[in-house]
C-alpha cells in the first residue's frame, strides 16, 4: 500500500517553491486542504515564516481541525511561537479538546510559552482524566516555576518546557 501519492508529492514540491517566496496567503489557504499531511506541514511552515500575525490562523487550526494530529501540531507550533497571544487558544485546548493527545501538547506548550497567567489552567489539568495530560501539566508547571525563580537563559528555559 502506497500512502505517499504523486499528487501529495507534487503539492509538496509546489509548497517548497512558495515557501522560498514566503507566500503567507498561499499557506493560509492550505490550512483548509483536504489532506491532513498537507495541513500538518502547512502549520509548521507558517510558524517558520514567522510573525505574530500567524497566531490567529494556527489557533483556528487548533480549535477547528477535524484531525487530532493536525491539532496537536498546532498546539506544538503555538508553543514554539511563544507569543502571549498564543496563551488563550492553548488554555482552551488544554481544558476542552476532546483528544488527550492535543490536551497533553497544549499543556506542554503553555509551559514553553512561560506565562504565569497559564498557571491556573495547568493546575486544573492536574485533575484531567488522562495521565499523560496530568504529567504534561507537571512538566509545564515545573518549567513555569523554574523560569520564574531560577532561569538565567530564556532559550534554555524554553527548551526545557517539554
Where are these regions (language model features)?
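Solenoidal tandem-repeat scaffolds enriched in leucines and small polar residues
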Residues: 129-135, 139, 154
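Amphipathic alpha-helical scaffolding segments comprising HEAT/armadillo-like alpha-solenoid repeats
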Residues: 18-32, 51-63, 83-95, 115-127, ...
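Core register positions within helices of long alpha-helical scaffolds
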Residues: 14-18, 45, 77, 109, ...
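Short, contiguous, helix-prone interaction/anchoring segments in small proteins
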Residues: 33-49
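TPR/Sel1-like alpha-solenoid repeat signature
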Residues: 46, 61, 74, 78, ...
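Alpha-helix N-cap/helix-start positions at coil->helix boundaries
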Residues: 5, 21, 36-37, 52, ...
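Conserved hydrophobic register position within alpha-solenoid helical repeats
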Residues: 8-11, 42, 74, 106, ...
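N-terminal "cap/leader" segments of large eukaryotic alpha-helical scaffolds
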Residues: 1-29
Amino acid at each position: 500500500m502506497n500512502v505517499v501519492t504523486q499528487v501529495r508529492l507534487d503539492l509538496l514540491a509546489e509548497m517548497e517553491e512558495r515557501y522560498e517566496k514566503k507566500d503567507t496567503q498561499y499557506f493560509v489557504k492550505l490550512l483548509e486542504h483536504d489532506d491532513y499531511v498537507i495541513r500538518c506541514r502547512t502549520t509548521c511552515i507558517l510558524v517558520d515564516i514567522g510573525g505574530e500575525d500567524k497566531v490567529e490562523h494556527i489557533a483556528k487550526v487548533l480549535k477547528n481541525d477535524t484531525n487530532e494530529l493536525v491539532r496537536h501540531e498546532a498546539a506544538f507550533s503555538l508553543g514554539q511561537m511563544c507569543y502571549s497571544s498564543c496563551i488563550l487558544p492553548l488554555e482552551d485546548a488544554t481544558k476542552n479538546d476532546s483528544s488527550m493527545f492535543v490536551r497533553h501538547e497544549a499543556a506542554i506548550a503553555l509551559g514553553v510559552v512561560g506565562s504565569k497567567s497559564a498557571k491556573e489552567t495547568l493546575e486544573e489539568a492536574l485533575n484531567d482524566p488522562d495521565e499523560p495530560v496530568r504529567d504534561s501539566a507537571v512538566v509545564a508547571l515545573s518549567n513555569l516555576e523554574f523560569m520564574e525563580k531560577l532561569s538565567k537563559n530564556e532559550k534554555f528555559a524554553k527548551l526545557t518546557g517539554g
